[in-house]
Amino acid sequence: MSKVALITGVTGQDGSYLAEFLLEKGYEVHGIKRRASSFNTERVDHIYQDPHTCNPKFHLHYGDLSDTSNLTRILREVQPDEVYNLGAMSHVAVSFESPEYTADVDAMGTLRLLEAIRFLGLEKKTRFYQASTSELYGLVQEIPQKETTPFYPRSPYAVAKLYAYWITVNYRESYGMYACNGILFNHESPRRGETFVTRKITRAIANIAQGLESCLYLGNMDSLRDWGHAKDYVKMQWMMLQQEQPEDFVIATGVQYSVRQFVEMAAAQLGIKLRFEGTGVEEKGIVVSVTGHDAPGVKPGDVIIAVDPRYFRPAEVETLLGDPTKAHEKLGWKPEITLREMVSEMVANDLEAAKKHSLLKSHGYDVAIALES
């Protein structure tokens, strides 16, 4: 009989990759999606199955991590073997604008799920995975960061996720639940939301190359991050629930790059070589040379990268670097996709969209490129 999995945040980057992964393993997959005024299922449309078909394996449920009765009803109906809590208000900058909502969804939402599992008597049947975050380390106490590194969160998002981390540990220890945290370092893909810095970079570089934008504005380009591919990370999430005993794991590559280096890699994919001049808010990224045919919209001397202080965080997280040794040694997990391969994939995806917009523009159509304010 097929295992049954329930994924919160199924329409997001990780949720969609995880749903694909589990379906390939023969699972019956149920996902929770929020009601929206427009369709927000584009990341899972390709695996959607008409409920009228015979024995569908993928199901969507309307729900919200702020609604206890809704979550309890879904858990009662689905009776999952595994729950993956990937749903969250996950944008660090936005969490400063909406701290109460962030706490309600990210912290209390995790508690609601754990308590619903316990209330329904599923604590011995259902295994629970909590998507934690490297943002817990914040003002880092040691480099690299591992499972035993002290936490020092620096945003409402990270503080909410800290509660979620510890309540997961508490329910594991108090009620004998199979509940564990995956401390995820930054992970990206072509499905990454467009307001996150990596996707903002690859999308803007593609648009600039096609003459649809003139300049990409960023915040702290000195920030150092450990970036992996979401496909690799969802595999590790599944592996964590297949052990005999629940444990918490860091999920990371163990390799670190700056935001500036990410920009340089993305530009290089389109034959654009950059040099950076100035410091702080005066720093600029200037085109040195252009090769190939993918960047007709830029020329040497163009300033295509600049700093906007609006994108600085109230409390910066300067450096994050994970130590995935425990994952390697205990589960045999290691990332398979390199950063350069991931950047290439993301840029190619965004370039395809930019070329379509450029073609429409060349035929006289107005093309509105949605940009982050």
Swiss-Prot record:
Pathway(s): Nucleotide-sugar biosynthesis; GDP-L-fucose biosynthesis via de novo pathway; GDP-L-fucose from GDP-alpha-D-mannose: step 1/2; Exopolysaccharide biosynthesis; colanic acid biosynthesis
EC numbers for this chain: 4.2.1.47
Record's catalysed reaction(s): GDP-alpha-D-mannose = GDP-4-dehydro-alpha-D-rhamnose + H2O
GO biological process, one term: 'de novo' GDP-L-fucose biosynthetic process
SUPFAM superfamilies associated with the record: NAD(P)-binding Rossmann-fold domains (SSF51735)
Effect of substituting residue 157 to F: Strongly reduces activity
List of residues binding NADP(+): 9-14, 64-65, 86-90, 101, 161, 187, 192
Cofactor(s) in the UniProt record: NADP(+)
Active site positions, chain numbering: 133, 135, 157
Superkingdom of this protein's organism: Bacteria
Keywords recorded for this protein, A-Z: Lyase, NADP
GO MF, any single term: protein homodimerization activity
Family per record: Belongs to the NAD(P)-dependent epimerase/dehydratase family. GDP-mannose 4,6-dehydratase subfamily.
Entry function: Catalyzes the conversion of GDP-D-mannose to GDP-4-dehydro-6-deoxy-D-mannose.
Record note on quaternary structure: Homodimer.
Name of protein: GDP-mannose 4,6-dehydratase
Organism expressing this protein natively: Escherichia coli (strain K12)
Gene name tied to this protein: gmd
